């Protein structure tokens, strides 16, 4: 017997219902007819039983119909639940992904928090170092150029003119140049203008320069070396006021005058070219500054020779310009050549050697060549240590070696020994202490990049001590000079009073 579908069952059941209903009606009609004609009781009982059976069949058919409807409802509910289960599976998978992403973000946040805490410590250290820088600037305006990396790396003509105007004997550089000599009145005026400018009194310095310039042009004409010198001085004052356009115009005018009057290959022309390159560098015009710097280099090589220290200074300037343009191959070549000149002519202990190594290491850092940069930084610090304490051995270690040992033993039970017990090694940086302090900070930053936070903090702490000691020493020196000056004035006044009394007593 084949299995019938639900629809067939329902259809057949309905047909049976109709047939049974018709049969019941017929039996009722017969029973009524029998009752009316008073048939015998057996037939009536039989019909009654048949009616009961038919009614039972009707009831069962109705139950079957209700059961079928219930089964249909159950099937629909089952389908609905399957859909919900499928959706819940999808939501569960999405929640798992979200949980994994959240955990990754949480871990990254924890790492970022740790990194920010280290950066906060580093910034606090830098702020403490800056405090000493600012104090030193307020005490000595001449030292402000150290805080300006462009001025630091560009020894411009302001410094050169000061040397030329100094009453000391002329240098080898000056001996190789003939002809023009800066008059005494301009030397005095230059010193006076620099003094006013260093005090920020530009309202006095600028009119003073302009008046002197007018007087020179009236007496000597525009195309005169003295006029060019005065234009240079005024340009430097404008540069300090950030009036770069006016300063550039003055320097170009001075360059033209010096080229006409002194010759295109005169050192003064090289100095003006260098000043103009510095000015363009401050304005970010590195591409325009580079040919000027190269021309100044050619002049100095021709006049002084290729291995003169002033040539090395110009090479440093040129390297910085190329570095700001991303020409790292040329940067490395110029810095290396400058370093060779300094080491051969001035010796390995000259401050310019450490400064150039620091600059070259900075070039390596920008290229991601951290190992080479680290080597140079360590060379600078090792040399500074050897100058003060002698050769390196197991008991006489430079600061970077001590820092790395503290990093290695930071998880030991014993506490790290304070670096102060190793001695004030930073006293080794007597002339070039700013360079050594900068090297400490740079190597500390490199250690932080490598996750060596204990070593970084050791170097930063030492740099801060060096700054503080230099500041305290400067304060003591100034106080001593002030007391000495007051004592000299007091002694002079007493001597004058005694001389006056002797003259008075000597009169009849």
Curated annotation (Swiss-Prot):
PTM-bearing positions, type Phosphoserine: 480, 485
GO CC entries: cytoplasm; kinesin complex; microtubule
Sequence intervals crossing the membrane: none
Principal location listed in the UniProt entry: cytoplasm
Coiled-coil segments: 34-129
GO biological process, one term: microtubule-based movement
Subunit structure: Oligomeric complex composed of two heavy chains and two light chains.
Entry comment, domain topic: The light chain is composed of three structural domains: a large globular N-terminal domain which may be involved in binding to kinesin heavy chains, a central alpha-helical coiled-coil domain that mediates the light chain dimerization; and a small globular C-terminal which may play a role in regulating mechanochemical activity or attachment of kinesin to membrane-bound organelles.
Cited function: Kinesin is a microtubule-associated force-producing protein that may play a role in organelle transport. The light chain may function in coupling of cargo to the heavy chain or in the modulation of its ATPase activity.
The protein, known as: Kinesin light chain
Organism: Drosophila melanogaster (Fruit fly)
């Amino acid at each position: 017997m084949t299995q019938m579908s639900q629809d067939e069952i329902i259809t057949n059941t309905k047909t049976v219902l109709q047939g049974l209903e018709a049969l019941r009606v017929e039996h009722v009609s017969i029973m009524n007819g029998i009752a009316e004609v008073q048939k015998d009781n057996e037939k009536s009982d039989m019909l009654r039983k048949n009616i009961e059976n038919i009614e039972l069949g009707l009831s069962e058919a109705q139950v079957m119909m209700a059961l079928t409807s219930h089964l249909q409802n159950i099937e629909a509910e089952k389908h609905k639940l399957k859909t919900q289960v499928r959706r819940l599976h999808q939501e569960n998978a999405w929640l798992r992904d979200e949980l994994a992403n959240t955990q990754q973000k949480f871990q990254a946040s924890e790492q970022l928090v740790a990194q920010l805490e280290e950066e906060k410590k580093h910034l606090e250290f830098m702020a403490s170092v800056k405090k000493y820088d600012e104090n030193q600037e307020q005490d000595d305006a001449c030292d402000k150029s150290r805080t300006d990396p462009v001025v630091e790396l560009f020894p411009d003509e302001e410094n050169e003119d000061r040397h030329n105007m100094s009453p000391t004997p002329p240098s080898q550089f000056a001996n190789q140049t003939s002809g023009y000599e800066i008059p005494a009145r301009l030397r005095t005026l230059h010193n006076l203008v620099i003094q006013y400018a260093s005090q920020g009194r530009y309202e006095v310095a600028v009119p003073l320069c302009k008046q002197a310039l007018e007087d020179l042009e009236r007496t000597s004409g525009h195309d005169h070396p003295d006029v060019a010198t005065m234009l240079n001085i005024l340009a430097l004052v404008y540069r300090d006021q950030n009036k770069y356009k006016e300063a550039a115009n003055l320097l170009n005018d001075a360059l033209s005058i010096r080229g006409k009057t002194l010759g295109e290959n005169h050192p003064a022309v090289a100095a003006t070219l260098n000043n103009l390159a510095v000015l363009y560098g401050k304005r970010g015009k590195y591409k325009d500054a580079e040919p000027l710097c190269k021309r100044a280099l050619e002049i100095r090589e021709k006049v002084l020779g290729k291995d003169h220290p002033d040539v090395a200074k110009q090479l440093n300037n040129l390297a910085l310009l190329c570095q700001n343009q991303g020409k790292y191959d040329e940067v490395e070549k110029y810095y290396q050549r400058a370093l060779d000149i300094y080491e051969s002519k001035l010796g390995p202990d000259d401050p310019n050697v450490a400064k150039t190594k620091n600059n070259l290491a900075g070039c390596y850092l920008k290229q991601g060549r951290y190992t080479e940069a680290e080597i140079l930084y360590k060379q600078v610090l090792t040399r500074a240590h050897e100058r003060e304490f002698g050769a390196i051995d197991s008991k006489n270690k430079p600061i970077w070696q001590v820092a790395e040992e503290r990093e290695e033993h930071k998880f030991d039970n014993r506490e790290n020994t304070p670096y102060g017990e190793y001695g004030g090694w930073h006293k080794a940086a007597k002339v070039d202490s700013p360079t050594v302090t900068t090297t400490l900070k740079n190597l500390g930053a490199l250690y932080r990049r490598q996750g060596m936070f204990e070593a970084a903090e050791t170097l930063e702490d030492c740099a801060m001590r060096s700054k503080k000691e230099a500041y305290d020493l400067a304060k003591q020196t100034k106080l001593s000079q002030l007391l000495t000056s007051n004592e000299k004035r007091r002694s002079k006044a007493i001597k004058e009073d005694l001389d006056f009394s002797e003259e008075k007593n000597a009169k009849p």
